[in-house]
């Protein structure tokens, strides 16, 4: 309908998968690199998660195309299966004949024999499960049992799980802890940034034959805001916006076209009216002198030095303090305030709804989620958002800012608490979310193909951490790889010679990068990194006996 009007060979924003419209953003590239590394490492499970429409299937298709030709793949698209159905589906994908009445053991044995035959023939075997958040715990356990099949040197089967964020929550269940421990690579795919949305739209238009910029800058800003950076929503909104512009006879897509299209697609009404725009402009004129204008655009105050304040006064355990804890818990039943406190510890004042992992790259940070023991979390040396269990089994959230041999400091709601380390161990389930500083260029993976800026940063950081002299370097050479592997071995990491998120996170600490640290406050020359908004609050002490 509108293609000829805009000089297009075909509709550029169809939601049907088409390889020629494949746009790999930096985040999609990172996800693909992590999955490839996990499969090359020979581990049991590789995990990719992301919200609906962020491009998980796009990444999985690229992964399948990049696998060696000697790889046999079982692609499971309908994971709403029983344990037997799963094994039967894998047999179907591997083209293994079986009797329709075959039970679990027979199907399992068929798959085992086939995996052994593939190994003898020099082939790799991979099972890829899409929409894996729909798998039942028993089915996930059956997959784990399949990955138990191994020789002295390698596993016979690797499994790629792709799903929505609920999959991460599922894997934190105690009954699935053995499976979670076998995940050798994981990546959470975030929505596109504003810059990526701009590039994504231009790319799809160019593929369809349009070389002129037909979306105005304001339209692209509105598109990013109303789509949330979700590629599927971007496609739907852009398609409707092209229709709207065509209907009014304009060759330019403007802010109003995007707003109308977004409302038609998702029912989201754009609150960015002229009245609110005027208020922002007036507020900006008043606040620019104090540096708050950046918050209007980015959701954060400008970066400040890491906040360090005086240790609050400790209070003895009393029934009143137990009641105070109950009140604090009631204000911390959602993770929002704990995440906001985590940003404050890093020196960023942000609105509650802006304090999310998705917004971390705006501040030059990355989110990392995982499971660990207290000792493992302490080794990471980063303050973290943690979930705790109260005496009734309910979940609440806190920010861990200090961790010593006997005590820990928490922020629960708007109050500081000191707890026994054993108390924390008893009531913490092991999951955490932390923020860490990205290297220059905003990348979370530095390897052979890294640019000169990232390579120089990595070499400088390794030199400081290993107490070696600095040098000039522009490419990822053998000396840099050796230094990186030495650092990884010293830190108990896999010495793969690739600086992924775990390596970069440890490197930030060892290289002395400016950051808040999760260290024992008794070892500090200064005082713990606690938000300055809590200066006047006394620290409440809670012992294990009091719990």
From Swiss-Prot:
Function: Involved in a general secretion pathway (GSP) for the export of proteins.
Annotated GO CC locations: cytoplasm; plasma membrane
Compartment(s): Cytoplasm; Cell membrane
Segments of this protein annotated with the region Disordered: 512-547
UniProt cross-references to PANTHER family, sorted A to Z: GENERAL SECRETION PATHWAY PROTEIN A-RELATED, PHOSPHORIBULOKINASE _ URIDINE KINASE FAMILY
Biased composition (Polar residues): 524-533
Keywords: ATP-binding, Cell membrane, Cytoplasm, Membrane, Nucleotide-binding, Transport
Taxonomic lineage of the native organism: Bacteria, Pseudomonadati, Pseudomonadota, Gammaproteobacteria, Aeromonadales
Pfam families (UniProt xref): AAA_22, GspA_C39-like, PG_binding_1
UniProt name for this protein: General secretion pathway protein A
Keyword Membrane annotated: yes
Binding residue positions for ATP: 50-57
Bilayer topology term: Peripheral membrane protein
Species name: Aeromonas hydrophila
SMART domains tied to this protein: AAA
């Amino acid at each position: 309908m509108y293609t000829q009007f805009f000089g297009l060979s075909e509709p550029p924003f169809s939601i049907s998968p088409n390889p020629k419209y494949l746009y790999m953003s930096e985040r999609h590239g990172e996800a693909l690199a992590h999955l490839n590394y996990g499969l090359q490492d020979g581990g049991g499970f590789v995990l990719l998660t992301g919200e609906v429409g962020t491009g998980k299937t796009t990444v999985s298709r690229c992964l399948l195309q990049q696998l060696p030709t000697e790889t046999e793949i079982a692609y499971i698209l309908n994971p709403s299966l029983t344990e037997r159905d799963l094994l039967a589906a894998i047999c179907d994908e591997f083209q293994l004949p079986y009797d329709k009445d075959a039970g679990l053991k027979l199907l399992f044995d068929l798959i085992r024999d086939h995996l052994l035959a593939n190994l003898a023939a020099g082939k790799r075997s991979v099972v890829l499960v899409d929409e894996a958040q729909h798998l039942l715990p028993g089915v996930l356990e059956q997959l784990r049992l399949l990955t138990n099949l191994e020789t002295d040197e390698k596993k016979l089967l690797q499994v790629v799980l792709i799903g929505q964020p609920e999959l991460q929550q599922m894997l934190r269940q105690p009954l699935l802890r053995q499976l979670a421990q076998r995940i050798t690579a994981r990546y959470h795919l975030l929505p596109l940034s504003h810059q990526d949305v701009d590039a994504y739209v231009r790319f799809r238009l160019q593929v369809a034959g349009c070389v002129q910029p037909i979306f105005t800058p304001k339209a692209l800003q509105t598109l990013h805001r109303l789509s949330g950076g979700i590629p599927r929503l971007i496609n739907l909104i852009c398609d409707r916006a092209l229709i709207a512009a065509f209907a009014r006879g304009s060759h330019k897509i403007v802010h109003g076209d995007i707003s109308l299209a977004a409302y038609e697609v998702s029912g989201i009404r754009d609150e960015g009216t002229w009245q609110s725009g005027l208020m922002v402009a007036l507020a900006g004129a008043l606040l620019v002198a104090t540096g708050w204008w950046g918050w209007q655009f980015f959701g954060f105050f400008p970066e400040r030095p890491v906040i360090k304040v005086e240790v609050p006064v400790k209070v003895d355990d009393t029934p009143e303090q137990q009641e105070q804890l109950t009140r604090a818990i009631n204000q911390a039943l959602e993770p929002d305030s704990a995440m906001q406190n985590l940003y404050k510890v890093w020196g960023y004042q942000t609105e509650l709804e802006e304090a999310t992992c998705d917004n971390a790259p705006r501040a030059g940070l990355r989110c990392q989620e995982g499971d660990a023991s207290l000792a493992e979390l302490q080794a990471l040396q980063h303050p973290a958002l943690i979930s705790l269990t109260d005496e009734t089994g309910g979940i609440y959230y806190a920010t861990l800012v200090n961790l010593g041999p006997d005590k820990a400091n928490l922020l629960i709601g708007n109050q500081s608490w000191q707890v026994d380390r054993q108390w924390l161990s008893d009531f913490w389930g092991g999951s955490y979310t932390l923020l860490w500083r990205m290297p220059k260029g905003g990348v979370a993976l530095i390897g052979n193909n890294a640019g000169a800026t990232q390579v120089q940063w990595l070499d400088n950081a390794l030199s400081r951490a290993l107490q070696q002299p600095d040098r000039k370097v522009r490419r990822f050479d053998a000396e840099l790889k050796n230094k990186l592997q030495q650092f990884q071995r010293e830190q108990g990491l896999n010495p793969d010679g690739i600086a992924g998120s775990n390596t970069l996170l440890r490197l930030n600490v060892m290289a002395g990068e400016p950051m808040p640290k999760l260290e024992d406050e008794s070892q500090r020359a200064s005082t713990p990194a606690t938000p300055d908004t809590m200066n006047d609050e006394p620290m409440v002490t809670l012992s294990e006996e009091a719990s």
